[in-house]
Regions:
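Positively charged n-region of N-terminal signal peptides that target proteins for export
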Residues: 1-5
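Alpha-helical segments with a strong preference for the paired helices of cellulosomal dockerin domains
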Residues: 818-869
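Bacterial N-terminal signal peptides
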Residues: 7-17
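Aromatic-residue-lined binding/catalytic grooves and analogous aromatic/hydrophobic interfacial grooves
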Residues: 22-463, 480-482, 490, 499, ...
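Extended, hydrophobic alpha-helical segments in both membrane/secreted and soluble proteins
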Residues: 401, 470-481, 490-507, 652, ...
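Extracytoplasmic low-complexity repetitive segments enriched in small/polar residues
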Residues: 741-744, 748-756, 766, 774-776, ...
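C-terminal capping/lid segments that line or modulate ligand- or cofactor-binding pockets
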Residues: 46-68, 73, 113-114, 126, ...
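Boundary/junction segments of secreted and surface-exposed precursor proteins
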Residues: 19-33, 812-823, 870
């Protein structure tokens, strides 16, 4: 076989050159001018940094730098029980109105007797601003950037023949924000440093090399609750060369070679019912400890911590010279392309796949920067807020937005960043137990559609807040964390929370008493978020038994039953839940072929932003094209009604994108993604918005929608490339997680799977769904596969082992009659071709011809129809 090794080498080189992705491009946002500062407005241009507890916006000014920052427990209000005493005494009256179809009477009764006290919750607050006055002018070569690989914002410019540089990062290990100032010449760094706040200044002074500001929140939100949060922020200046002097409440740095600023902040918040903390001593100790380490050690600790999370996942969709353009111009180009295409998506030609990858990693960056163990969970604006009255108070909205913030935490390998939401759920199980008792005379716990720093759980704003299934949705996340990680000790810890949520519904679900009804167990009163039942007119806001509620409760009962079985506890309660689950209304298909939003078939086509009755499609994963095709088709009818326009909010568009990926409609999801990039992203890619209403949930929802183009794992399957858009011809992703304890990397070429690697952390059975035939190996050893169904491949794994998945050819006839059977895979092809050459076959066919033939074969194996061979 004298040609065998050469032939295999040539083919291997050619194939690898095709499969290997190009340079994924720089994961950097950059701009050629500073961000514009406005007081009491959260910037859509400044660059965000954060460590979970501290969050800052960097504006990059030359004459004056402003770093607006938040400490995530600085809110209006004080510890407060929002429950409405005596509310349970009116519950039956409200229910009776609903059963009688008198929803307006139910609304009025609830408004007077059942709502939160006060009616609104408290707003998240800005903390302070670090101001550095340079008085630089006449600058050139300006560049402002955010490097996602190092979590570092930077500013560079030249003035007076000197190039100045500033780098900014937030350290989770040291809980400080660090600013590093350098210059191209020694002795050129001079500035004045001060701290300001929009709140009451208790004291503002200089202490040694520190500027210290003590403040008290004085803003009273629209609910009228007095604000009792106090805080301290302190910046320490570490000079290399030059001098430091004081000037009133500021410090002046003169002619330094380099400077490090260490900024900390703390409040008197201990937990939602304790504000006895000492912010002064805590802030002083934090800043002193960090400053003592010095800049190199601070930097290394920050990088080690951040990159251990960020580097877990890579996404390579290729790159182009578009990466040479400022980020805002790239977004503008996509917007121009979307506008030019109008309603004919085939005309869209402004693809920027590297920007798609950048957007994906930007969302992961925001999740890391805004949500870490020990911090508060992300709210509607994440952690970055410069407004005393942010939109919707910057709270945690539980009927879609808060959960969307965390949909992608597990799949994008940031399970630690999920922890603040899980901690919030634990807090709400306590305040929600009070509301369950006071409002519903029920055991267990529940929460309505919003909460704040003080963990309010009662219904707020108006009677439309009577949405009782917040706990059920939050418990979905408790269960997901177990599904991905498999830690039984964790499951033991959270099982009481899940059980408590189920106990509430076991106490409060009521059998439909209306004549002619099917006697289902229903929630009453309830509300489908922002949507009245169209058949009831003014009586349609407060109803019984929405589809969303039934989906969430059915899911909750299922999680609790599974968890109880794993832990071998509460057999009788599991039996009760099983019986009650069978009495919940099923998903129903209506007269238009739509998935019904209501118990009755009364849906009217509409474009409203909420997709509440599609929870079973996304995020729950109980509706899928393969397992429930009729319901999947019914969900698609609803999505087609809703449309893809961005006149709704970005979170709604992100939800639609996620739904399309769940329906395996990658091209449609990609279209929505580009519309979001065009119309709903701000220049800094930080907030998705409607008008000036800044929100972060759209960013994080798109993160989930993008990840699930490449990998989905509900229904017990590791689904490879389930919704790959046609425009993503070649690429790779590494580090995504699948349920069952798997970490997955995938490479594709010509829109088809090439290879995948699967790391098994738990030794679970792995069931793969793949549109392409596959073989699996561990090292050089083939792994036996079972086929439990079409396009399904199942094999056993061992904990700590890595498995390689390789897609092979669709059965095709091999030219030159190499084999009588003519049905071979690639390995067979190489061996047979080599033997054929050795035996003198193929007169007039040389080695190069066969190498090209192998590449042709490679093309064909990614074409399931085999049309290239016809």
């Amino acid at each position: 076989m004298k040609y065998n090794m050469w032939f295999m080498f040539i083919v291997a080189v050619l194939i690898v050159s095709q499969i290997t992705g190009a340079d994924p491009g720089p994961l950097v946002l950059f701009y050629n001018s500073p961000a514009v500062y406005q007081s009491d407005v959260t910037s859509n241009e400044a660059l965000p940094i954060g460590n979970g507890k501290l969050a800052a916006m960097v504006y990059g000014g030359m004459s004056e730098e402003i770093i607006q920052f938040n400490e995530d427990t600085v809110w209006a209000g004080h510890p407060h029980d929002y429950a409405h005493a005596g509310a349970a005494g009116y519950l039956q009256q409200i229910r009776d109105y609903v059963w009688a179809g008198q929803g307006r009477a139910a609304w009025n009764a609830a408004a007077n007797t059942f709502m939160s006290v006060p009616l609104r919750q408290c707003p998240y607050q800005p903390t302070a601003e670090l101001r550095l006055a340079f008085n630089h002018s006449g600058t050139t070569n300006y560049r402002r950037q955010l490097d996602l690989t190092t979590a570092t914002a930077s500013v560079r410019y030249t003035t007076g023949g000197v190039t100045y540089s500033r780098d900014y990062f937030a350290s989770y290990p040291d809980n400080v924000i660090v600013v590093r100032l350098t210059a191209g010449q020694a002795g050129k760094i001079s500035f004045t440093c001060s701290l300001t706040t929009p709140h009451t200044v208790v004291s503002n002074s200089v202490s040694g090399n520190d500027v210290v500001l003590r403040g008290a929140v004085d803003h009273v939100g629209r609910n009228g609750l007095a604000s009792d949060i106090e805080f301290e922020t302190r910046v320490r200046i570490l000079c290399e060369g030059g001098s430091i002097s004081s000037s009133g409440q500021s410090l002046v740095v003169s002619q330094a070679d380099a400077v490090t600023l260490v900024l900390g902040a703390a409040s008197n918040f201990v937990n939602y019912n304790d504000i006895s903390g000492d912010p002064g001593s805590l802030c002083l100790q934090t800043v002193a400890d960090a400053a003592a380490k010095g800049f190199p050690a601070l930097r290394q600790a920050q990088l080690n911590d951040y990159q251990a999370l960020f580097n877990r996942v890579t996404l390579d969709l290729g790159t182009s010279d578009k990466t040479n353009n400022p980020t805002n111009e790239r977004l503008d180009a996509i917007e121009a392309g979307v506008d030019a295409a109008k309603n004919d998506w085939s005309l869209f030609n402004a693809d920027d796949l590297q920007l798609v990858a950048l957007n994906f990693q930007m969302a992961r960056y925001l999740l890391i920067s805004g949500s870490r163990p020990g911090s508060q969970p992300l709210g509607l604006q994440g952690k970055w807020n410069n407004e005393l009255e942010p939109s919707w108070e910057g709270k945690m909205t539980l009927n879609i937005n808060e959960e969307m913030n965390y949909w992608a935490a597990e799949v994008t390998n940031l399970a630690e960043c999920h922890q603040p939401l899980l901690d919030l759920t634990r807090d709400l199980s306590e305040t929600g137990a009070v509301v369950a008792n006071v409002h519903y005379d029920a055991d267990g716990w529940m929460v309505h559609h919003n909460t704040d720093l003080w963990r309010g759980a009662a219904p707020i704003n108006n009677a439309g807040g009577l949405w009782p299934t917040g706990a059920a949705w939050l418990c979905m996340h408790l269960w997901w964390h177990y599904e991905y990680g498999g830690d039984v000790n964790y499951l033991e810890e959270v099982y009481p929370l899940m059980k408590g949520a189920a106990e509430f519904f076991a106490d409060t679900l009521v059998q439909d008493p209306r004549p002619g009804s099917a006697g289902y167990l229903l929630t009453n009163p309830t509300h489908s978020p922002e949507q009245p039942n169209p058949a009831l007119g003014d009586d349609g806001e407060i109803v019984a038994g929405t589809t969303m509620d039934s989906q969430l409760i059915r899911g909750l009962f299922t999680y609790v039953m599974k968890a109880g079985e794993i832990l071998d506890v509460d057999a009788d309660f599991r039996q009760q839940l099983q019986q009650m689950r069978a009495q919940l209304p099923p998903n129903q298909i209506g007269r238009y072929g739509q998935l019904q939003e209501w118990l009755e078939d009364v849906d009217v086509p509409n474009t409203h932003r909420h997709l509440s009755h599609l929870v079973d499609l996304m995020p729950a994963g109980n509706i899928t094209p393969h397992h429930t095709p009729e319901m999947a088709a019914a969900a698609e009818v609803v999505l087609n009604w809703k449309g893809d326009d961005t006149n709704n909010t970005a979170w709604s568009q992100a939800w639609k994108m996620c739904c399309r990926t769940r329906l395996l409609q990658g091209n449609h999801a990609y279209m929505i993604l580009n519309k979001i990039l065009a119309k709903s992203h701000t220049d800094n890619m930080t907030f998705s918005r409607k008008g000036n209403e800044n929100q972060i949930d759209g960013n994080l929802g798109v993160l989930m929608g993008t990840a699930e183009m490449f990998l989905q794992s509900h229904q017990g399957e590791v689904y490879l490339l389930p919704a790959l858009p046609d425009k993503m011809v070649a690429g790779s992703v590494t580090g995504l997680r699948a349920r069952g304890g798997f970490t997955v990397g995938i490479t594709w070429q010509n829109n088809a799977l090439s290879t995948a690697t699967i790391y098994s952390s738990r030794g679970s059975t792995c069931r793969i769904r793949s549109a392409w035939p596959i073989v699996v190996a561990e090292g050089t050893k083939s792994v036996a596969l079972q086929s439990p169904g079409e396009n399904l491949y199942e094999f056993t794994t061992q904990a700590g082992h890595i498995y390689t998945v390789t897609a092979y050819s669709c059965p095709i006839p091999i030219p030159y009659d190499l084999d009588n059977d003519c049905q071979v895979n690639f390995t067979d092809f190489v061996v047979l071709a080599s033997e054929w050459i050795d035996n003198g076959g193929g007169e007039g066919v040389d080695l190069a011809d066969l190498a090209q033939l192998a590449l042709d074969w490679l093309e064909c194996r990614r074409d399931p129809a085999g049309t290239c061979w016809q």
